[in-house]
Amino acid sequence: MSSDATNDELHRRLFDEGIKVRKDVLGSEYVENALRNATPFTRPGQELITEWAWGTVWQRPGLDRKQRSLLTLGLIIGQKAWLELGLHTRGAINNGVTELEIREAVLHAAVYCGTPSCIEAMIVTQKTINDMVDKGEYKRPEN
């Protein structure tokens, strides 16, 4: 097998594995829309994210998906990437992170990222969770 064929096979395998994880975490509808709406310019970015983040990093040992989701929320808050925060809040819920844990992650990030980030993060995460409740995608636990 040539080096190019081996390289192509590796990329295909990482992409396929990445798609599975990405759909599990973010939801099939979101991932399928992202790929369907990719242009010739943005498609390589979708492939890179899927192979590298989802096909490699999210599958490494040492952290489970719940831990990775909490870590991701904090990093996204630090970057002030609010659209991504909504997306990864949904993913965190899908990975078993509770509303309480999300709130505490946001409050924890406030200490290191600043209160303006905390305020915006509270708005985004609360809206995302409420949207999931309204759509029947998430049921709040009984107290």
Curated annotation (Swiss-Prot):
EC identifiers of the protein: 4.1.1.-
Pathway involvement of the protein, from the record: Mycotoxin biosynthesis
Pfam families: CMD
Coiled-coil features, chain-numbered ranges: none
Needed cofactors: Mg(2+)
Keyword Transcription recorded: no
Origin superkingdom: Eukaryota
Sample GO molecular function, one term: carboxy-lyase activity
Keywords on record: Decarboxylase, Lyase
Role played: Nitrosuccinic acid decarboxylase; part of the gene cluster that mediates the biosynthesis of the deadly neurotoxic nitroalkane 3-nitropropanoic acid (3-NPA) that acts as an antimetabolite of succinate and irreversibly inhibits succinate dehydrogenase and disrupts mitochondrial oxidative phosphorylation. NpaB facilitates decarboxylation of nitrosuccinic acid produced by the nitrosuccinic acid synthase npaA to yield the final product of the cluster, the lethal mycotoxin 3-NPA.
Protein family per UniProt: Belongs to the carboxymuconolactone decarboxylase family.
Protein name in UniProt: Nitrosuccinic acid decarboxylase npaB
Lineage, uppermost ranks: Eukaryota, Fungi, Dikarya, Ascomycota, Pezizomycotina
GN (gene name): npaB
